[in-house]
């Protein structure tokens, strides 16, 4: 009887809401740090183990995921979605640019276990570009061992294109390996509540409760930037496309897509909701049936904001100087990282080390930034997904309505 109860409890823990479990871990960590400082410092080992597991699995995940995605790409699918694709890419880059501006206007700092003396900052854009180029030609084994994500991406893309010409058995093997690594990542993510409990407890025990304000400030910057993109940047892009008041369409998408995505925290799970909204808006079925799933994969404005804000928070914490060209390059890198965020369990957070590489920030410190992201992830991930998913249907509707008006005007002229 006791065994059955124990197995039932474990099953509920394994299948329960990760968001609620992280929230419980966060609260318990705060309480433990408040009640007993020595005990809170002791359970810091749980957080260290969690961050170590993330560090171990992330490089392999990026390699296998990108390689499998390119190798298994299907040829011959012809759709007229260029304007939507352009809006997706422009919107993601605009979000990253807005995040850079927001981060410099309201700089955030984090509590990291390394000082600025550990960092050798790049002197400017030329050195950053040189470092990126040298990272690209790194040995693949060396890139995996040292978590050189630029080198990993180059090898993953190259091998992916090479394997496109391989037989189906090879492609299936690569796909199965990708699924296996993804399973391992999901397994690690299931321990996030325990890791967060350890991280919060030890952090508060060693730095004090003032750390919470630092995270609150970071969260305000993140969510504030996402609101800026949702209510100012995206409406400007939609107005540029349809040449009329964009806000009725913007609010409809936020209300009927964003709210669902906020609670599901999954762009993929929100695809049926977006499809139904597109049908309600009388959009072209052949267009939205392709653009909505595509948007769930590459339209990642929220992820671009998360990557940019957290990377610059680490940069500000470590005192690394950033010039304007480097900040612009970060916007481009964050946009490219964001386009790959959909396939990563844990979302955009595990792609932060890739952006941190630009500034000479070691993988150890970058993974501490990822851990901070998990601490604030209860709200951050929900807001990020709401922005990502609602923007999918918003840009699809804008492009379709603009095309309908163009065809109507041409018909009147003729």
Swiss-Prot record:
The keyword Cell inner membrane applies. PROSITE patterns: NA_DICARBOXYL_SYMP_1. The keyword DNA-binding does not apply. The chain crosses the membrane at residues 16-36, 46-66, 84-104, 143-163, 180-200, 219-239, 300-320, 332-352. The gene is sstT. It comes from Salmonella dublin (strain CT_02021853). It holds the Pfam family SDF. It comes from the Bacteria. It is found in: Cell inner membrane. This is Serine/threonine transporter SstT.
